[in-house]
Amino acid sequence: MTRTRVEAVHIVWITAGLGCDGDSVSITAASQPSLEDVILGAIPGLPRVYLHNPVLAYELGGDSFMTWWYQAERGELDPFVLVVEGSIPNERIKREGYWAALGTDPATGQPITTCEWIDRLAPKAWAVVAIGTCATYGGIHAMQGNPTGAMGLADYLGHGWKSWAGIPIVNVPGCPVQPDNFMETLLYLLYQAAGLAPMIPLDDLGRPTWLFGRTVHEGCDRAGYYEQGDFASAYDSPKCLVKLGCWGPVVQ
């Protein structure tokens, strides 16, 4: 962890994993805080934020957009937070071509794979965040029989991996991610970068504890029916749905 205050933080967001870009779309619906409030500096105490997301940066394209990636690789965007969206394919088992890539190498004209970008940028990132179930756990692409060998970011980098600032991989699952969950996590990291918050608290799965420390059941408005043993027998009932397959008492 670093206590040195920073004036600006870049968010370098890779959407080139195996995914649907649903997490990028989801965060546009965030409200506590909203993406606009964070980027426009409406929240007191935050450093200036520059977002580099290929899905949301519709005014830029091609080589002009990739400039930020090359600058991050050269250490010119310091500090930056690396956000990874989509599961990570195993390029080592791909005999020809590639599974996923973002941009091309200026020297060779060849695509730069998602794995290469992670290898280049993760060691230089102040913090690394996996957004969505695909990036955190591999998602549906990690099912048995998928030829890509897809995996979550922690499986790729290692579950004990930490950034140069000593921050473990931060996992914010969801399909798509619940927008406020991600924005709250990003907000905490920005306050930490500003020296206004301690190390982000994470559970044993790398998730923020204040978001995933309790079960869904604990916050459910049907929990009173559960305590009374009054369970629904049909999905249109307002009563507890645990007998119909709800995993709320288990899922965090």
Language-model features: locations:
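Iron-sulfur-associated redox domains of electron-transfer enzymes in respiratory
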Residues: M1-Q252
